[in-house]
Regions:
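Gram-negative outer-membrane beta-barrel transporters
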Residues: 67-73, 171-173, 194-285
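Outer-membrane beta-barrel channels and translocator barrels
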Residues: 14-18, 68-71, 106-110, 148, ...
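Surface-exposed extracellular loop regions of Gram-negative outer-membrane beta-barrel proteins
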Residues: 32-39, 105, 109-151, 171-196, ...
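Residues on the lipid-exposed face of transmembrane beta-strands in outer-membrane beta-barrel proteins
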Residues: 7-13, 60-66, 101-105, 153-157, ...
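Outer membrane beta-barrel strand-and-loop segments of large Gram-negative receptors
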Residues: 4-12, 48-61, 140, 144, ...
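Transmembrane beta-strands of outer-membrane beta-barrel pores
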Residues: 15-17, 26-32, 56, 68-70, ...
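Face-selective signature of the C-terminal outer-membrane beta-barrel domain
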Residues: 1-90, 106, 163-166, 224-230
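C-terminal beta-signal and adjacent terminal beta-strands/loops
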Residues: 175, 227, 277-301, 316-320, ...
Length: 396
């Protein structure tokens, strides 16, 4: 359970083309957690503890905004500093200075350029900060703030509010990310299948990076057809420390594509369609040998991943098409609308990695307890069906 008490003081003033905002914040966080957990690494272990954390956070921030007289140029410069009393590595404001800068300039009436850069800090999860070992000791006190340096730059071309084309490139660099000492996987790379994240021994040594380019266009044709599309090409990687090699992160889908259009028909009818496509995410195969051990399976009742082959496999690309039809009635003082929405009209199947499960039957009951194994089976994970929706909208 988390409970926050926050105090924030802020002042904003303006002078001609300048706007200045400065302030300070003081937060007190109470975190409580009662854990009973069985894990199996090389042998079975049990963690049974109660945690209470009372953390005092403090910070300073300031931003200066400037807009030129002709409004062609805008700039924003900011600085923030954060600290807390949880651990020695987190107590100094100067260790968590977060500068940020954004610029925008209209080169012509139709073409504009923009860019931004910033450094941001974030606390590790409270589940990790409050984790205790079998001797009831907080063992992650050495954790520090996570940081991300972010850069982006782009161009935008617009014509008569009828057509807009934007291209933007970005780069993000992550540092001091908590990594699991047991399996060497950063917490940010652990997806939903991992359950609770952070309740283990951690070290702030992992690094990550993501970079890519995004293209966006909007087109309004004859006030009837409205088209919009975007495609993002990117790469997401991580490494456990500075000496190791980068490998694919859990979010490395490579590309995301969307296109949608709406056509306005006579008598207040409209028809819309959307097509979405996303690249397959990488995944880690199971460690069948470890998972089949009776002592290992009984410790957590789910399979174990083969971290020596982390994210070596990749899921299939998934695409989906949706259609929506609207009919609108404009009455004297209100608007009444009816629509039918058909999601996934092709009934495309989203295929996930097969799940490894125990049958509950021991294959070698005559073996010693530590060597007994379950017979295992796999269950396919395919989802996706046509989903119709009928709706009514009313505005007064």
């Amino acid at each position: 359970m988390e409970q926050d008490t926050k105090l924030r003081l802020e002042n904003t003033s303006s002078f001609r083309n300048w706007k200045i905002n400065i302030g300070a914040n003081l937060n007190y966080t109470q975190y409580t957690n009662t854990t009973f957990q069985r894990v199996f690494i090389r042998s079975g272990q049990t963690y049974d503890y109660h945690t209470y954390l009372g953390i005092l956070h403090w910070g300073l921030f300031g931003t200066i905004n400037y807009t030129s007289q002709d409004e062609r140029f805008t700039a924003s410069l900011g600085l923030r500093a954060d600290a807390n009393n949880h651990a020695a590595a987190m107590k100094q404001l100067s260790d968590q200075l977060s500068p940020r800068l954004s610029l925008s300039y209209r080169l012509t009436e139709q073409l504009s350029a923009s860019g931004s850069a910033g450094l941001y800090y974030q606390l590790p999860p409270y589940t990790g900060m409050g984790f205790k070992d079998s001797h009831d000791r907080l063992i992650n006190k050495q954790l520090s703030y996570m940081s991300v340096s972010q850069f982006s730059a782009g161009l935008s071309w617009q014509k008569n509010n009828m057509f807009e084309l934007t291209v933007e490139g970005f780069y993000k660099d992550y540092n001091k990310v908590p990594v699991s000492i047991a399996d060497g996987i950063p917490l940010t790379c652990k997806g939903n299948e991992y359950g609770v994240v952070g309740n283990e021994a951690l070290a702030s040594t992992a690094q990550g990076r993501s970079y890519g380019v995004e293209l966006l266009f909007k087109w309004l044709i004859a006030q009837k057809l409205n088209l919009a599309s975007s495609i993002t090409l990117f790469k997401s990687e991580y490494r456990t420390n500075k000496e190791s090699e980068y490998i694919n992160s859990a979010w490395d889908n490579r590309f995301i594509f969307n296109v949608r259009g709406t056509y306005n028909l006579p008598r207040n009818w409209s028809v819309g369609m959307k097509i979405s496509c996303i690249g397959g995410a990488p995944y880690t195969p199971y460690d069948v040998d470890k998972s089949s051990l009776v002592t290992a399976w009984d410790a957590q009742a789910k399979p174990y991943y083969d971290y020596s082959r982390y994210n070596e496999e990749r899921l299939s690309t998934f695409a989906q098409a949706d259609i929506r039809i609207d009919k609108t009635f404009y009455l004297k003082h209100c608007m009444l609308g009816f629509y039918i929405d058909l999601q996934n009209i092709t009934a495309s199947k989203l295929k996930q990695a097969d799940v490894l499960m125990s049958t509950g039957v021991i294959a070698n009951p005559e073996a010693p307890q530590a060597e007994r194994r379950y017979n295992m089976k796999t269950i396919k994970q395919d989802s996706g069906t046509l989903l119709p929706t009928l709706g009514i909208t009313f505005e007064y």
